[in-house]
UniProtKB/Swiss-Prot annotation:
Keyword vocabulary terms for this entry: Disulfide bond, Ion channel impairing toxin, Neurotoxin, Secreted, Toxin, Voltage-gated sodium channel impairing toxin
Domain notes: Has the structural arrangement of an alpha-helix connected to antiparallel beta-sheets by disulfide bonds (CS-alpha/beta).
Stretch forming the signal peptide: none
Lineage: Eukaryota, Metazoa, Ecdysozoa, Arthropoda, Chelicerata
Entry protein name: Putative beta-neurotoxin
Tissue and organ distribution: Expressed by the venom gland.
Domain of life: Eukaryota
GO function terms (MF aspect): ion channel inhibitor activity; sodium channel regulator activity; toxin activity
Keyword Repressor recorded: no
Length: 20
């Protein structure tokens, strides 16, 4: 979880970059 967030769709993406 460190440095990462989870979108409402459950997709993981970097806090510093756009969802990928």
């Amino acid at each position: 979880k460190d440095g990462y967030l989870v979108g409402s769709d459950g997709c993981k993406y970097s806090c510093l970059t756009r969802p990928g």
